[in-house]
């Protein structure tokens, strides 16, 4: 996170009025990933679909990151609880380090206009629960580097329900360091 981010950016729950802007951010993110060696993670299926984003908003699990001026520059899914992510129940090549209730971030994306948006969103989510899990595609080196920079540890591999595609699983916990 950059100095002054707290004054510059804030997180709030997404509203239906934000949908068009959220969709624009995902278009940018898919293009960014394709240009940075990760064309498969969201590109072929135009992930995430609009109906899933609408569902996330309706269920109160979609968030946006706004600048101090109210411009939406990032978005993500966040939920927390005990055993809340079914695909995280089975992990190969390793193990989760903390079995306590956790938060999950999915579908994190920014429009690229504000440096540090992804870090700000992840720091906010971690601050809500002190134990966060996230997964990413093996080709998503940008996200892998960000997670490592923020103190997340790679724990193994999980498989996404929709297509049984492998994802690198990361975790950060107040209870387990290093």
Predicted regions and their residues:
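Conserved GNAT-fold acetyl-CoA-binding loop/helix
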Residues: 31-51
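Conserved acyl-donor/pantetheine-binding loop and adjacent beta-alpha core of acyl/acetyltransferases
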Residues: 77-113
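A short beta-loop-alpha structural element at the N-terminal edge
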Residues: 10-24
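Conserved active-site alpha-helix within GNAT-family acetyltransferase domains
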Residues: 139-156
